Amino acid sequence: MTAQSGGAAGGTWRESERALEAGIDYDRANAARIYDYLLGGACNFAVDREQASKILAQNPDMAYVCRANRDFLRRAVEWCLAHGITQFLDLGSGVPTAGNVHEIALAHRPEARVAYVDFEPVAVAHAHEVIGGLENVSVTRADMRDAQGVLAAPGV
């Protein structure tokens, strides 16, 4: 099974060796990938799109809700920056799509620091591809239910 090509930004997502080694379950829908699909992202699989269709059948406004959530994220980061907050910990960060915390923060304050944390292997692998070697931005695979483990993780 392959990831969907295209997406809101018109790019493609190729499965990295890191993602393949991460033990991705291609047969089970995943919340991070469903959210990515509902935002128009490109890192989701047929099983995720099928589940999203079921969700949309029950709640046709769900894609709008996801976009509203993303809009709130942008406003919240901008507000924090305007008030001197320059360090961000994004727990359950999901699959990177347009308008990520680091894109917003670094556009306004290049010295800002962003740590992404997610447990889902596809989200973490794709985040590593998107983030690359950006200074002041880290990606960590950890379970946010283990607060001490998250805070002790390298990069956080």
Where does each model-flagged region fall?
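Rossmann-like AdoMet
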Residues: 1-142, 146-156
